[in-house]
Amino acid sequence: MTIQISQPPDSASRYLRWAAILFAIGFGIHGLDHLRRGMSASPPFVMVGGMIQGLFVVAAVVMALTQRPRAPEAAIAVGFGSAVVFTYAHLLPTFLPGYQDSFISPPHINVTWFSWFSALAEIGTGIVFAIVSMRARRSVEKASAPLLRLQPRHGVSR
């Protein structure tokens, strides 16, 4: 028995791939800003967390580009998760100094307009990645809905 998994319709799949590329670019720009600012500008927890998050970003982007069946779910989690984590880490005042690299609370080492641009680019592209993924997931569900409909058994009325 062969199980065939339906792919998202062309437009949803195409938008998901473009959103994945944009998110990868946003993540890369943010990484370049961390290199520009110097590795000592952020607490070690932020640097390690960013590297771990990078693994999730790569996985979600590769899944979207290769049209894996669970790519939309991964992209929703990684896109929204990244937006929330980076908003906390960079845009809010410092609550826990070892876990934040706040741009608005001191010491904000080497923070320039490019730092703000890179953080907002990553947050924005993360949100776009997640929203486009929600739409791609919905289109997959609509396309497979007739396949999931249960057939009535003999003698059972609906």
Stretches with model-predicted labels:
Residues 62-91:
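Loop-to-transmembrane helix junctions at the membrane interface
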Residues 1-11:
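Short, Lys/Arg-rich, polar N-terminal cytosolic tail immediately upstream
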Residues 30-56:
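Transmembrane alpha-helix entry/boundary detector in multi-pass membrane proteins
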Residues 14-28:
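Alpha-helical transmembrane segments
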Residues 10-15, 113-144:
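Membrane-water interface at the C-terminal end of transmembrane alpha helices
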Residues 141-158:
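Short, highly charged, low-complexity non-transmembrane loops/tails of multi-pass membrane proteins
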Residues 37-45, 88-114:
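Interfacial non-cytosolic loop connecting adjacent transmembrane helices
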Residues 55-66, 128-132:
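Alpha-helical transmembrane segments in multipass membrane proteins, preferentially the mid-helix core
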